[in-house]
Swiss-Prot record:
Name recorded for this polypeptide: Chaperone protein ClpB
SUPFAM superfamilies in UniProt: P-loop containing nucleoside triphosphate hydrolases
Subcellular localization(s) per the UniProt record: Cytoplasm
Keywords, alphabetical: ATP-binding, Chaperone, Coiled coil, Cytoplasm, Nucleotide-binding, Repeat, Stress response
Gene Ontology cellular-component terms listed: cytoplasm
Native organism: Malacoplasma penetrans (strain HF-2)
Amino acid sequence: MEFNFEPSNEKDILKKYSRNLNEEVSANKLNKIIGREQEIRRVIEILSRKEKNNPVLIGEPGVGKTAIVEGFVQKIISKEVPENLVHCVVYEVNLSSLIAGTFLQGEFEKRLNALIKEAKQNNGAVILFIDEIHQLMGMGKAGNNSGMDAANILKPIMARGEIKIIGATTSNEYRQYIEKDGALERRFQKILVEEPTPEEALTIMRGLKEKWEIYHKVRIQDNALVASVKLSERYISDKYLPDKAIDLIDEAAAKIKTEAHTSPSEPINKKIFYLETEKIALSKEEGTNQKERINEIEIELEKLKQERDLVEKEWKEQKEQQVALNKIKKEIEKNNWDVERYQNQGEYTEASKILYSVLPELKKKLEAIEKSISENKKVLIKDYISEIDVAEIISRITKIPLNKIFEKEQDKLLNLFNNLKKRVKGQDEALKLVSDTVLKNRVGINNPNRPIGSFLFVGPTGVGKTEVAKSLAENLFNTEKAIVRINMSEYMEKHSISRLIGAPPGYIGYEQAGELSEQIRRKPYSVVLLDEIEKAHPDILNVLLQVLDEGTLKDNQGRNINFKNTIIIMTSNVGALYLMENKEDMFERELKTSFKPEFLNRIDEIIKFNSITMEFAKEIAQKMLDDLEKRLKDNNYQITFDKSVVEYVAKNGYSKEYGARPINRFIQKTIENFITESILKNELIKDRSTIINFANNKLAILKSN
């Protein structure tokens, strides 16, 4: 068997294993970079050094590390860099193609050395950009005994300053791979790339708007850009700006573009198909009625076909308008780019021709097409993205109803106390304390580095402690499911702390996430309900001190979990007996015995829940019966409960000791059983208004129309 290896042409090695970013910027293939001036300036400063002139961009995924390099290349093209960098060409090295097919020992090293040799021959005019630079560690190793990986080949060359490299990687991967190799780390100069602020992200989005409009053939309203930043910041916690906001706009634009290619005549075509199918079926039968129906179908088909032809004609015309509009926009973008290019090259005559002759003519054409589009009587093609479209994408991701996303925060907060009162009866004082604390946080009076609110709910069982938590989740975070409930009776042993934040390194289960930390990482806008907190081991409460004070918690993987957008509610029955007997001093004493002072001192409010009185028992019974009425209505049973039933339920279900739960059990045992029997006996009929009352010591049905 013969092997024939053809040596690769060294002159083409850069083209083969990398892409020329200067060429792509010159051809207007890359997005124009807005902002990040400080980071780009830092890259220029490091590259201008004599030694250690290799910057490495470190930041979370999606914050714009690659965009900074592209921004630097744009500065080179527009000659906004020092003289030593004006003639530089930046190549992005493709590491995967560099190592692909190197099955023989030494082949990878040969390719890499050829790449370095060509870069060196250009007297420092070639700058190599390596994305995911941590992959150099171990790349190309032939075996465990070989140390010739890519990093070891590059280290001496980088130390002498013979080649300039720009790297990019994430914080975790830099720590995990590059920091371990001190020799490689000291050859790089770190540039930390932070996530941009919402204002900076919005500026970046506005700079990208024109490119998206031309690509997707849609107009993007400014309120859509604002909504993408605002909503992604609030509802998407596992990604970073501007990447997550860009994703929303891109997906919304793709959705509109897909809808634009769907003919509006499709529903009409379906109707025509159904009628033609019916006509064929009827034509096989004989009879006067069938013939009359066939005549009716033919008349209807004629109308529908005319309507379809008209709609399709209008749709095609509007589509042609959109194509013409997009063509003009592309020409304007190309000419704008040419103006910039000619100005950079000093060809001001050519730039002036485009600026004062070609562009005004194109803009007139654009205005004429936009005017004709606005005059369309019936808009069949939606050609713009609004904040509603962005919210629909968020709604799809988070499963939060669209109307809840757009509900005004101010209205939500002003009605918070009243909304809580509707659901929880007899605890007005407790609800007022909770709502006031939440309002202070939302207005910005509270410390922003703490959770929205932290509460210890104390009181007898069945008085509405858990119900308040559910109601808060629904009113503040738009869904009752935004509640992270942990039963603290499961954390009675000291070692169970590992279940809460994850097992430490070296222990079984280290790779698994903690119950509390992982849920908050996934759902940062939540109500955290720690039920029966007094039953947890005291050391577990020590973990919560950091959460209550700083609003953060470090999990077993070393990640900081943000609790600043959560409400922390802890429930306890400590001293409940003394509260029922109005013995405040005894209650305070038992509370201090059960919990450490540093724990109690970090809680915003200790909220005492009252025992339920007979008056409030009637209100609770009324609410539970109203809920039962709604459930029955969903099954088409129009049932109303008389006041006598409310009195009967409250009187027999009320228990000062056990709260509202016995009322619910009594309704299940008596009222629901009575309704079930009545339905089976056909005494209750669907869609008939019925009143149920309590008289002569028994439940009775009063029928009405």
